[in-house]
């Protein structure tokens, strides 16, 4: 599964989880981090283009942002909120490319595919991918 295949959201998103057996679990551990309170500045992460972001990429961005904020402001010096939720199912119709594969696969017949990952669609200049408030200037 390559990320470039799922970067653009073509067509209607598929989010009907009740019809699929073996749904992938969401990899995002927490949607809020730090300590709630009043803060001086707000740092926001926004997207430059309309795209789909996989849940693994959202989790890695959250981890790196929280680590950077924790190093500069301390454990209780910030509060971060993740505003997007990956609810779109990404499916893949796996193809076998070895000798004798024509006897094992059906090609495009019954090509619904298996659910392999989750993603969130983000619009251009969407300001709520992540928001962090901190007491000091970062």
Task: Give the residues covered by each predicted segment.
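Ribosome-associated RNA-binding proteins
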Residues: 1-137
């Amino acid at each position: 599964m390559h990320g470039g295949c799922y970067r653009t959201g073509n067509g209607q998103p598929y989010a009907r989880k009740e019809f699929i057996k073996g749904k992938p679990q969401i990899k995002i551990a927490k949607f809020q981090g730090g300590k709630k309170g009043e803060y001086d500045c707000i740092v926001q992460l926004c997207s430059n283009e309309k795209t789909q972001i996989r849940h693994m990429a959202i989790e890695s961005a959250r981890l790196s942002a929280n680590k950077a904020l924790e190093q500069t402001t301390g454990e209780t010096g910030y509060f971060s909120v993740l505003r997007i939720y990956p609810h779109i199912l990404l499916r893949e119709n796996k193809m076998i490319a070895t000798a004798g594969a024509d006897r094992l696969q059906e090609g495009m017949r019954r090509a619904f595919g298996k659910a392999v990952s989750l993603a969130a669609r983000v619009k251009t200049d969407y300001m709520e991918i992540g928001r962090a408030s901190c007491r000091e200037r970062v």
